[in-house]
Amino acid sequence: EGESEVSNQWLGNINSIRGYNEVMTSPDIYSLFNNYKYLLICQTDVWIFRDDLMKWIDMGIDLVGAPGPNRNMYLHFPMKQYLQLKVKLKPANKNLHCQMFGRIGNGGFCLRKVELFKNLCIKYEQEIQLYNSLEDPLHNEDIFWALVPTELKLPTIEQAANFAFDRKLELCYKINNYTLPMAAHGYDRKHRKQFWSRFIPKEAFKKQ
């Protein structure tokens, strides 16, 4: 309850995305919520269609966010093998977009288990330092949580699509049986407006 202030080094214009990545991979931020089981992260470019929050809390999962669904062509030969080889041959400190195919947890609108994430920030301290030293979008904090820890209890891609959409909107819509999720992240981005304008009032979109 109430408000808590955090350092400008974390949030604001000083360090921008880098500061945000640092805050969301620090045990200190999760310690602010020690009295709570879950932390719901809701960024300012989120549109919420309904409140299903208790349903997700009752599932007992560790993390849920918009999924990165895998197109059917990447699930079969030869594209499946091609992507596997591409990942195997990449430089150690480089992430590829295809590594997020079939992963859970876009950070714009997500639910995280507080105590577990606080402990994981400590357990993976060295890996986190490496990620935060590499300033490219494929090393953002939500990419870290999607790719590095292996012990997270996650929903299926189909379940996560009922929580939120972020990318591959038509595919997410199909996976979710042509129904809307609880929320949309990044709904007002120019290249997503065509999809979301069917469901969100035009007044909600920034003038572009």
Model-derived features: positions:
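Alpha-helical elements of Rossmann-like donor-binding domains used by nucleotide-donor carbohydrate transfer enzymes
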Residues: T25-D28, K55, L63, L116, ...
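Short beta-strand-to-loop acidic/aromatic patch adjacent to the donor-nucleotide binding site
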Residues: Y36-F49
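Conserved donor-nucleotide/metal-binding helix-loop-beta segment in metal-dependent transferases, i.e.
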Residues: V46-K90
